[in-house]
């Protein structure tokens, strides 16, 4: 319709053409944080965090309670997000990875629809041929280039061209050195059950929350730019928190805290403000959803499924299952290998640890904080239980996430849940087969997909 309108309306002013294009093809804006636990946002229940911009944004759109990603690490997550493909399927499943040559990304899918596509901030995807953004401006000293964001939007508006803008913050990824720590009183924090309550734990969390607040201000700046450029009403805006923070039981794990993400979508005139959706959606669904909103179809097969109909209110449900994996081979201070696979059905999370005989380790287990936890474990039962659970895991785990969101009580040994395990195991194996995931053999090939490990 848009092309036909333009072809018969060549006499109209550029301003009128621009307006018509924006109405039929909304601008697409996605802001993604870096290592931010969804439960550390006020609108997702945090009583300690200070996230006024995100919380207010949630009153303007729909807040998804069950948004998940396929990997609890930045690089595979972002490849998954920008390609609409499962990590093993695209080749981008370890950390610091790259997609297979010939893979198509959101840029390829939106270009034929007339969109200009930009990425401002953290990249963490490769190669360039797979991600040929029209504009890429990296962060400087960990901070976003807001001038570049405003210029990109203004240029597209002037040309009457719809745009897709990804804004990728570096916060609150460690080191936690941004934001105002004085806003938070360590002694008044409410600690999640997996944390060992020592002064250093509380100090680290205050630094993390200060950086969450810093990220919230960045998001607020982006929203302000949309208003200043008068494109907010013609833009679909998505906020994502990415995987959980780097404290134990979140990032680098397939526990719910590792792969459960905040997802809030504002679409003026379409999405009901202040609404909440329990539809199960995944990062892999973003590309087909964006392409669907833009009025087209992906140029080639993608693994994700559009949830536009959920946004428009035509459907309340989306998926029955979400799937995730963790490849620890090659991570910073990681083990030789420790592969994890997981399936989730909206209530129960099933986890398979491919090599339970190995010790799980990462950058967190090498920190003074975790070492203090281990030292305390010699005399403190909770510290002993948490440090052991984090590093020594059984072959299978099952959690009732609805009643145990932090995955503390493993139900796998209870015969009452045998049928649930059988069902989720079958779904997980079906997904792995569809992705070409051969389990431990795939784990051992991780270096083949990490440029830094190739000779």
Model-assigned labels for residue ranges:
Residues 2-5, 16-397, 405-433, 437-455:
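Formylglycine-dependent sulfatase
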Residues 6-11:
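Sec-dependent N-terminal signal peptides
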């Amino acid at each position: 319709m848009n092309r036909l309108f333009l072809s018969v309306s060549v006499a109209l002013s550029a301003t009128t053409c621009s307006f018509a294009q924006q109405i039929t093809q909304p601008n697409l804006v996605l802001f993604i944080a870096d290592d931010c636990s969804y439960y550390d946002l006020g609108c997702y229940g945090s009583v300690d965090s200070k996230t006024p911009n995100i919380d207010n944004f949630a009153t303007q759109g729909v807040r998804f309670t069950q948004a998940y990603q396929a990997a609890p690490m930045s690089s595979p997550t972002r490849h998954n997000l920008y390609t609409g493909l499962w990590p093993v399927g695209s080749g981008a499943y370890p950390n610091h990875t790259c997609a297979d040559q010939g893979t198509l990304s959101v840029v390829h899918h939106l270009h034929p629809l007339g969109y200009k596509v930009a990425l401002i901030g953290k990249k963490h995807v490769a190669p360039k041929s797979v991600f040929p953004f029209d504009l890429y401006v990296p962060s400087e000293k960990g901070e976003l280039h807001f001038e570049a964001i405003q210029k990109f939007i203004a240029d597209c508006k002037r040309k009457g061209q719809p745009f897709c803008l990804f804004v990728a913050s570096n916060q609150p990824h460690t080191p936690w050195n941004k934001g105002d720590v004085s806003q938070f009183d360590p002694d008044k924090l409410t600690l999640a059950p997996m944390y060992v309550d020592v002064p250093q734990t509380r100090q680290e969390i205050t630094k993390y929350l200060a950086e969450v607040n810093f990220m919230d201000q960045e998001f607020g700046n982006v929203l302000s730019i949309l208003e200043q450029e008068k494109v907010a009403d013609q833009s679909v805006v998505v906020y994502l928190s990415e995987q959980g923070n780097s404290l134990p039981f979140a990032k680098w794990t397939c526990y719910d805290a590792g792969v459960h993400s905040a997802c809030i979508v504002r679409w003026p005139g379409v999405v009901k403000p202040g609404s909440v959706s329990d539809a199960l959606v995944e990062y892999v669904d973003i590309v087909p959803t964006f392409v669907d909103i833009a009025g087209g179809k992906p140029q080639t097969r993608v693994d994700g499924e559009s949830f536009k109909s959920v946004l428009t209110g035509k459907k309340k449900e989306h998926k029955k299952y979400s799937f995730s994996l963790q490849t620890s081979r090659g991570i910073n201070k990681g083990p030789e290998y420790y592969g994890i696979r997981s399936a989730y059905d909206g209530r129960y999370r099933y986890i398979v640890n491919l090599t339970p005989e190995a010790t799980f380790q990462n950058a967190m287990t090498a920190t003074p904080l975790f070492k203090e936890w281990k030292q305390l474990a010699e005399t403190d039962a909770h510290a002993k239980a948490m440090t052991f659970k984090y590093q020594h895991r059984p072959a299978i785990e099952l959690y009732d996430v609805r009643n145990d969101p932090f995955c503390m009580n493993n139900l796998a040994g209870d015969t009452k849940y045998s049928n649930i395990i059988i069902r989720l195991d079958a779904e997980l194996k079906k997904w792995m087969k569809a992705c070409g995931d051969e389990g431990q053999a795939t784990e051992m090939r991780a270096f083949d997909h990490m440029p830094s490990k190739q000779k």
